[in-house]
């Protein structure tokens, strides 16, 4: 054994882990690198041991003697806010870390004047990203200078560098962070963890490289979890189905500490609950609550899946009570394209004010309904019920905040052979950034895609950047790369003008080179232009060292809002309790589509995760706070055989917030799936009088439980 550290041994050497999305009046409840004085959840790091190989380290870890005095756990949201609830942080006097408020219009008057008022409580269960690759970190320290190099499976190496510098009190210039190829992130790696501090700290102490790789059990108990919320929703509705007001009291189970992006799910939920609907009056009170569970943070879509689920279940409940067609009720309340842009009167932490930019929500709905032939489904459903089969159709329409700032950087550089290198601050985990960014630059410079190399994920190579999260990479990072390419072309035309001794207005750009208009044989290729730009004394005064490169930082001008409608057709077998997804359809609007195949892949992957959360996945705890979902035998994931065919359509409503009209597409598939699937299950089980107010998981056992407790209806 080479080293042992505890919280006490590093108390004066490291600070707590940061949370960057706290509101000003929040109780910070920051996570210690190693537990200090109190352990607040199973899975919290207590000590670290270092050995020559992982087997010796595992054995040494068994020798660590921990003495704990048991404290009463608090796990449930309602229990956590009770007057006599045990406090996770006594100094705060409460388990509520913060409360987000929104007040739009006159909610009280709308409810007083409403023809109908509907109230429902919706529960969102706890599940998480569970990427194929768990987390890992490797650090080494440069002898003499003490400069740290950290390899980490992170979604934001530049922010990780900033956070590590703050926690260790080391200048950022003394830190290099490299994010190698990462096997999935989905938000779990968009957080900053204890191991990302401990590994470089130990490397510095030992003077040798130190590596840590998380196993699956560690991942399932220690890596941030997601989704768990409870929402008390009330809707004020006119007799014709117009939703006049929504009021919501919301709580998010944030677990035992406020992690890097802990407030974001609650903020997005409360800022976006009304989705694509007008609903002129709105009140939200959204609480972040501390409990003795693993900390909660962002997961693909953050608070959007919860918001879409609650709103779309509420719309179906209203339609059923009014005897209206579900699609027609949606159309009646949807914002039209002529009403955009639309200031919603809310805001989202780290993003800004919610002002819907572009879209055609009713058309998106109609296109999705056509994909699965909604018009004929009622007849199909009656015929199937006569045969003893229970099928249902579900709809979920939503609007999604994408392209979150503050900025992203890109450098575009041409070498003497005409090959192009793009350095981007965005970092991929399988989204296809390399293809997308190369395509944007190649299209602008009119060169072959194979001639463009994209480099990402190294803070020494790319000194400035933000990272990959919040469906921002194409719209922010891609825009930076495209603008960089535009500047390279502008410079190339200046060089060509001098070298060919013509005015710039007499030149045109064609097929990766500058040529004289009307005389295509008089031209310079991109590589020749790069050589001319760097040749000593070859350019007039003021243009010396005029390299054919450009670094561009694209600032987000606002939030670009994507939207979609998901539709699902399911069958529920009352005898076995099995839910089968028969067909699935998505019409997605992410503005200008750069690569349809990649967008489809993102949508399909998100739908798969939505199916997983709705039918299979759940983090379960016992009454003492012990996690019970600690292997993939207990935490179930969807298999290929569980996936339906997914019909995908695209609607393009370019945003005016960047020059190319792009919006984000990375998270949308996961946003609409829970709402569409649960609405479909509820539709299938309507003859049994089943009421669904949770997003899942709808396992066979859960379906049987619901059927036993339900009262059959006359339908």
Model-assigned labels for residue ranges:
Residues 37-38, 171-179, 202-215, 219:
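Conserved catalytic cysteine-centered active-site region
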Residues 36, 133-138, 230, 392, ...:
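Short glycine-rich loop/turn motifs
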Residues 20-29, 94-137, 228-313, 399-407, ...:
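Glycine-rich loop/linker segments at domain edges
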Residues 1-95, 117, 272:
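Flexible, low-hydrophobicity surface segments
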Residues 8, 169-174, 204-210, 239, ...:
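C-terminal catalytic domains of large/alpha subunits in multi-subunit enzymes
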Residues 14-19, 60-63, 130, 152, ...:
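Short acidic, glycine/serine/threonine-rich loops at helix termini
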Residues 107-168, 393-425, 431:
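Conserved beta-alpha junction segments in alpha/beta enzyme cores
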Residues 185-207, 211-213, 433-441:
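Thiamine diphosphate
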